[in-house]
Design a protein with these regions (language model features):
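Short hydrophobic segments within beta-strands
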Residues: 6-8, 35, 109
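N-terminal beta-loop-helix "entrance" segment that forms/cooperates
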Residues: 36-54, 149-151
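Helix-loop-strand module that forms the ligand-binding subsite of alpha/beta enzymes
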Residues: 50-132
């Protein structure tokens, strides 16, 4: 089985990357593929056709995956443009299929040092994914507030991470 992580931060020491890596441990029996904002060009319809090798590879991995987890930061109470750019690329039809996201199993997670733990960004992402006809269990999200930069928040949230992963496994294996 295969799982794709779209990790919405390139930053060294990214809290969302750290959270994604911890969630990945709960999927030890899965093939894990990660993509980051720098794996995507800035979306431009002029670049859609003919489809370039880099986006073909990403689309192929997502097509083969049982599920996709987006680990997104929240900037200024919203989804970062880099994360939206990833979704925009994946939402576009290509020559082979109309919609890649429609019918695909998705989950959204995030961590921040602030009060809401990326809840507003997650709400926006979930709304976009719903409009794109993704299968998403909106009740299974993970928003971690007040995270420390040393990663102690991981130890403090081990049970939540396991519970999230277990619930997503059930969702994608149904």
């Amino acid at each position: 089985m295969k799982l794709v992580f779209l990790i919405g931060s390139q930053r060294e020491g990214s809290l969302n990357k750290l959270l994604a890596k911890e969630i990945e441990k709960e999927f030890a029996d899965y093939d894990i593929v990660e993509y980051y904002p720098n794996d995507f060009k800035i979306f431009n319809q002029d670049l859609e056709h003919p489809e370039e090798a880099w986006i073909k590879k990403i689309r192929e991995d997502i097509r083969e995956a049982e599920g996709v987890i987006i680990a997104s930061p929240e900037y200024n109470y919203s989804v970062p443009g880099t994360v939206k750019n990833m979704v925009d690329w994946l939402s576009r039809p290509n020559d082979e299929e109309k919609y890649l996201i429609g019918g695909k199993n998705f989950a959204v997670v995030g961590v921040t040092q602030g009060l809401d733990g990326t809840r507003l960004a997650q709400k926006e992402l979930i709304a976009v994914l719903h409009q794109l006809r993704a299968n998403i269990d909106a009740s299974n999200f993970m928003a971690v507030p007040f995270a420390d930069t040393e990663g102690k928040f991981i130890a403090d949230n081990k049970k939540r991470i396991k519970d999230f992963a277990d619930k997503f496994k059930k969702f994608i294996e149904k």
